[in-house]
């Protein structure tokens, strides 16, 4: 999906209280940002933010962080969140602009309990496969940041990406907890959905889901 350029997006991000301008300052000390020692869950590729916001509202004993590479996409998510709730009301959530390849600058070893990869760009061309967020290059980074028994959760509507992801996880010696080839038709209720997922389900699209541990 092509993202429309928004002039001044970088400066506009700073206007929102959920925006973390320099997340690297909290490496190994995210308790200073959240003011507690609760576990951290990270969504890589935030989109519009519905999934993470819903989780944060329900699970107040977990700290949720959302990473988005596109400043424009992040700005839209921040605007939407700002209309819904204040950080005082939802103090267990924060969003930041970063490249997932540089996550080691933001988190230390074992800092994250769970990583969510929801409807990531499939990068269908073979020459672009290293850009996929489930490529081995990214999985090696995630592994270093996940806590003992830490999890990766993947959801996608793209079968080719799902099968690629399973193979990459296997090659990196992750352990499969759950592999579902038709999430919403297997009688499994999943109340936490992204905006894309809601549209796909209404359109009758198949949703694939995987949970794997280190």
From Swiss-Prot:
One Gene Ontology molecular-function label: tRNA (guanine(46)-N7)-methyltransferase activity
InterPro entries named in the record: SAM-dependent_MTases_sf, tRNA_(Gua-N-7)_MeTrfase_Trmb, tRNA_methyltr_TrmB_bact
The protein's annotated pathway: tRNA modification; N(7)-methylguanine-tRNA biosynthesis
Pfam families attached to this UniProt entry: Methyltransf_4
Cellular component GO terms, alphabetical: tRNA methyltransferase complex
Active site, per annotation: 121
Binding site for S-adenosyl-L-methionine: 43, 68, 99, 121
Catalytic activity: guanosine(46) in tRNA + S-adenosyl-L-methionine = N(7)-methylguanosine(46) in tRNA + S-adenosyl-L-homocysteine
Residues that, per the record, bind substrate: 125, 157, 194-197
Root EC class: transferase
This enzyme's EC code(s): 2.1.1.33
Sorted UniProt keywords: Methyltransferase, S-adenosyl-L-methionine, Transferase, tRNA processing
Highest rank taxon of the organism: Bacteria
Family per similarity comment: Belongs to the class I-like SAM-binding methyltransferase superfamily. TrmB family.
Function statement: Catalyzes the formation of N(7)-methylguanine at position 46 (m7G46) in tRNA.
Database matches in NCBIfam families: PRK00121.2-2 (NF001080), tRNA (guanosine(46)-N7)-methyltransferase TrmB (TIGR00091)
Name of the protein in its database record: tRNA (guanine-N(7)-)-methyltransferase
């Amino acid at each position: 999906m092509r993202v429309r350029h928004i002039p001044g997006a970088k400066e506009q991000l700073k206007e929102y209280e959920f925006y973390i301008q320099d997340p690297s300052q909290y490496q190994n000390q995210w308790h200073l940002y959240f003011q507690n020692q609760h576990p951290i869950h990270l969504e890589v590729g935030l989109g519009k933010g519905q999934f993470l916001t819903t989780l944060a509202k329900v699970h107040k004993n977990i700290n949720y962080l959302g990473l988005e590479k596109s400043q424009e996409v992040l700005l839209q998510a921040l605007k939407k969140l700002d209309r819904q709730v204040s950080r005082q009301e939802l103090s267990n959530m924060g969003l930041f602009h970063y490249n997932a390849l540089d996550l080691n600058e933001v988190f230390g070893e074992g800092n994250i309990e769970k990583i969510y990869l929801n409807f990531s760009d499939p990068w269908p061309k073979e020459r672009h496969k290293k850009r996929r967020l489930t490529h081995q290059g990214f999985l090696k980074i995630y592994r270093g940041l996940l806590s003992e028994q830490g999890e990766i959760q993947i959801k996608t509507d793209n079968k080719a990406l799902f099968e690629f992801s399973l193979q990459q996880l296997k090659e990196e010696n992750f352990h499969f907890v759950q592999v579902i080839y038709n999430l919403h038709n297997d009688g499994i209720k999943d109340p936490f959905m992204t905006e894309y997922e809601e549209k796909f389900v209404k359109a009758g699209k198949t949703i694939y889901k995987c949970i794997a541990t280190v």
